[in-house]
Amino acid sequence: MSDENNQQDAQQAAGGPQFAIQRIYLKDLSFETPMGVEAFTKAFKPNIQQDLNIQANQVEEGLFEVVLLLTVTARTDNRAVFLVEIKQAGLFAIGGLEGGAVTQLINTACPQILFPYAREAIDSILNRGSFPPLMLPPINFDAVFVQAISQAQQQAETEKAQGETIN
């Protein structure tokens, strides 16, 4: 254990990369059952939709709040059976990295850490609402990040091409 501490101290003294979880917390949780009692008296197989977003802000030098926003909706016949919205957040200390590496860490490692907490909170609130368990599939945040970067680059190229044809 002291060897690990010595390595961490040496990394910090040398200005090496640093990443630490300071706190994980539930920032907001909302649960709705728009169908009311109908949700429990009729037989149906709802369609589950999952929407995901990541927000981050720098709280102070080297300290970032990362919020995983997750919305899970169950629908049947275009009617919402239930709706769960959660903001699972964490404070992360990040140092010794440049801008692009920090952005990647915030959009991949941080949500990867937060997701199991959000998934458990969603499952728990659905259980309390008398719904069956919902096992959300794992999310590959690295792939989501790469896809978002690719889409942003394509959009920038499209806008640049449109700007050149106008001039």
From Swiss-Prot:
The keyword Chaperone applies. Keywords: Chaperone, Cytoplasm, Protein transport, Translocation, Transport. GO terms for molecular function: unfolded protein binding. GO terms for cellular component: cytoplasm. It holds the Pfam family SecB. GO terms for biological process: protein folding; protein tetramerization; protein transport. It is found in: Cytoplasm. It comes from the Bacteria. Belongs to the SecB family. One of the proteins required for the normal export of preproteins out of the cell cytoplasm. It is a molecular chaperone that binds to a subset of precursor proteins, maintaining them in a translocation-competent state. It also specifically binds to its receptor SecA. Homotetramer, a dimer of dimers. One homotetramer interacts with 1 SecA dimer. This is Protein-export protein SecB.
